[in-house]
Regions:
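Non-cysteine beta-strand/loop elements that form the S-adenosyl-L-methionine
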Residues: 95, 133-140
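Gly/Pro- and small hydrophobic-enriched strand-loop and loop-to-helix capping segments
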Residues: 91-100, 142-143
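A short acidic, helix-capping loop that chelates divalent metal ions and anchors anionic groups
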Residues: 84, 141-146
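As written
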Residues: 131, 183-185
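Short, solvent-exposed loop/turn segments at secondary-structure boundaries
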Residues: 146-150, 199-200
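Conserved N-terminal beta1-alpha1 strand-loop-helix module at the mouth
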Residues: 1-93, 106-133, 158, 164-167, ...
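Beta->alpha turn/N-cap motifs
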Residues: 138, 191-192
Length: 219
């Protein structure tokens, strides 16, 4: 598919995209997830699964899916495109262009396919050309290390200026949400910043929502 230039129509307000910690036991986490989703405008939840056999992983997905989908958000799986249909998820987020290319045919056109872990501008464009529903910049690598924020901000700004396909910018903290919004992110992803203090999840989401406000237009 050919990349389309950015539509000059008025920009909608960005939305939140939540990344879970690796989930081993869905029972206690389900309440935390519901608290987060009830507190703000969350478009999608990326479910990261702790290691387990296939049946165990599918059961975890099925246990958490209602908390997400009944609240109008999409449930995406980190990596495991092969479990999307059987677990009742809405799609998968694939890290790296090789993983995305290998999985895209199992997801499209019925399911969401997100492209992340992108090492270069070229990889981002390849993912979009192959059918990505969104691209993500700045997410943690497998060791948990994030790129320098200035590089993420620059990449989001470049993409948002040119391309129609939505872009997600990963924010390590609440303080970096507003710069990503100003750069043009359609969605802002949050991970550990949400789950670090279980008793404060709802307030963290509400505060994140305040940072999502679009900047005032220049006069």
């Amino acid at each position: 598919m050919a990349l389309r230039p950015k539509n000059p129509a008025p920009r909608p307000a960005p939305r939140l995209y939540l990344m879970t910690p690796p989930v081993a036991d869905p029972s206690p986490f389900s309440d935390q997830l519901a608290s987060a989703l009830d507190a703000g405008d969350v478009a999608a939840v990326l479910l990261r699964l702790a290691e387990g056999d296939e049946r165990t992983l599918i059961n975890r997905i099925k246990a958490l899916a209602p908390a997400v989908q009944d609240r109008g958000a999409a449930l995406l799986l980190a990596g495991r495109a092969d479990l999307v249909a059987r677990g009742g998820a809405d799609g998968a987020h694939l890290s790296g262009i090789a993983e995305f290319t290998a999985a895209i045919e199992t997801l499209k056109p019925e399911r969401i396919a997100g492209s992340g872990g992108l090492a270069s501008r070229h990889d981002a464009m390849l993912g979009a050309e192959q059918g990505a529903d969104y691209v993500m910049f700045g997410e943690p690598d497998p060791a948990g290390k994030c790129p320098v924020f200035a590089a993420v901000e620059e990449r989001v700004g470049w993409w948002a200026e040119i391309f129609e396909i939505p872009c997600v910018g990963y924010s390590e903290s609440l303080e970096t949400i507003s710069p990503l919004v100003a750069a043009g992110a359609d969605f802002v992803a949050l991970g550990d910043a949400v789950w670090r203090e279980p008793d404060s999840i709802a307030e963290t989401i509400r505060e994140a929502g305040r940072h999502l406000r679009l900047p005032e237009p220049a006069t």
